[in-house]
Amino acid sequence: MIRRSGYRITRGVAVVGSTTIDRNICNGVGRLQLGGVTTYAGLAYRRHGLPTWIVTRIAPAHRPLLSRLSAAGIRIHAAGSDRTTQFINYITGSRRTQQMPSRAAPIRCNQVRRVLDRVDCIHLGPLHPADIECAVFHLLRDQPTLVVADLQGLVRRLRSGRVIAGAGDALAPALAAADVVKTDADELETVLGALGGDVAGLMAAFAIQEWVVTARERGGQIFTACGGRHPYSAEPAVAGGDPTGAGDVFLAAYTAARFAEGLDVDRAGAQAAAAAACHVADGLGRRTTLDLTPNRLQPEG
């Protein structure tokens, strides 16, 4: 049985997750940039004209970086943290490996409660299992708000600072809170390995309306609660482009097209694929790229 249905986003979206400082080394070329779901999805929602809030945690020394997001019209709800989440992404072709040398403190329920009455969609984008405290998922399960969840961070583990596949304890509570879920094809295998069954069975068990599965240049597919399966094709992307954040952009563009613009699944998927391809071609890079000069970033306290 579907827990929530018939949604239209009219008041806005709150994106919940880490704001990160990423060192992306793409095909041998490195750059430092502002990242995380709050950056990529937040800017994508603003490009669709939706009022957008972010709920995040960041070290005080790095808080001025959020001005890049507020300049785009994003409203900031940021709590302090001893550290800022940082990733090192090594990208060669379609292959990516990650390290996470630093992570912020978890996002708490009281932060999320502050935006609940201002929006009609919560976009959850945890980047690691402890990014958002599990109580947030329990809180959102009982709310009338549309909940969109990217599971990427809940199917990751850390081993000696390296990011590897592995499901955590927060996976099931996040699924129980979500109406729309996104994984890539590899992440889906991790979910199914941890919980068993298939996509249709999990959607029924957790009352999920739509499940988006991305597969980079192979396109992907979108499953619906009524048993539908909607394949979509990937849009051609610029060779050698940086794919970091493309999944965040895809999910935000899909959510906006589907629930704000009222497009059907197929058209929303096609629009999201086009937005992701534009992102890989660096459509957002001019706003988010940071200077590589070391003294432009203050050390964390």
Where does each model-flagged region fall?
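Conserved beta-alpha-beta core of the PfkB/ribokinase-like small-molecule kinase fold
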Residues: C121, G125-G201, R218-G219
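Short, conserved phosphate/pyrophosphate- and ester-handling motifs at nucleotide-, phospho-/glycolipid
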Residues: Y45, D184, G247
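Short catalytic helix/loop segments, enriched in acidic residues and glycine
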Residues: R31-L43
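A short, N-terminal amphipathic alpha-helix
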Residues: Y40-P51, A204
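Active-site metal-binding loops of divalent metal-dependent hydrolases
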Residues: G17-T19, V249
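Conserved N-terminal subdomain of the carbohydrate kinase-like
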Residues: R3-G12, I21-L32, R47-P126, A130, ...
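Short beta-strand scaffold segments in enzyme catalytic cores
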Residues: L43, F87-Y90, G220-F223
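Conserved phosphate-binding/catalytic region of the ribokinase-like
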Residues: I2-T10, I164, G168, A172, ...
